[in-house]
């Protein structure tokens, strides 16, 4: 039996808990492999060296493979995103424990760790699959950069904000011209992140959709677009200035030159979340983002007793 641990090495609590979880598992006969969240951070390229290419399948840490029953993630949302970039190709289900701040993507808190681990070891859990994206940058019809994304891909001007022009092909539909500070291409999971702040809708996780959200568009008619996740997307920068920057899940970036093309499609891999209770997305929205809460106290609606 093999299990894994991914932890945020920059947080002393996560480091301490990782060692604790390892001891618990090894005492029960599990083979345990550990890796840090930094392994899923792709880093940023530089204008004078715009290519920083790590193939998707080369991010899998040593010892982690498809035979692993599960892995425990100890950190915040950034560590969860990093863990899935590393482990999604192996389809390892992850138990996510929040040692960070918001923890929108985590299943439990530190106080829940040991009961949650016991529940997983008993096999008393379900798995929720989430859509991921494959993001590729092509230059002269050759892939020069790629990454997995659970939340979103963003393209904007670098280093200052300013109007950008894009031509976008969604599936076989007519090409769309967009003038905006940038573009966000988001999964349903990412619809509660940057896309939400940019005015995009919240999409429940089970919907087979993606969304394209312009950032501060220079048009009253330019709005977020929701479309089937089976449709690939091509983005062509149409800008007189030299560089744009492409960012995946807030931490991995690649400079985009005017002749480059960006190709995004639903990834062949899934983010597999271990759920200890039936997922209730609206409850998470209320708890984490304050959505749907009453502004004033009001009496409950009563069922009519009239015949």
From Swiss-Prot:
Keywords tagged on the record: ATP-binding, Cytoplasm, Kinase, NAD, NADP, Nucleotide-binding, Transferase
Pfam families in the cross-refs: NAD_kinase, NAD_kinase_C
Catalytic activity: NAD(+) + ATP = ADP + NADP(+) + H(+)
Cellular component terms per the entry's GO annotation: cytoplasm
Entry GO MF terms: ATP binding; metal ion binding; NAD binding; NAD+ kinase activity
Active site: 77 (proton acceptor)
GO biological process: NAD metabolic process; NADP biosynthetic process
E.C. number(s) listed in UniProt: 2.7.1.23
Reported function: Involved in the regulation of the intracellular balance of NAD and NADP, and is a key enzyme in the biosynthesis of NADP. Catalyzes specifically the phosphorylation on 2'-hydroxyl of the adenosine moiety of NAD to yield NADP.
PANTHER family reported in the protein's UniProt record: NAD KINASE, NAD KINASE 2
Protein name as it appears in the record: NAD kinase 2
Provenance organism: Thermosynechococcus vestitus (strain NIES-2133 / IAM M-273 / BP-1)
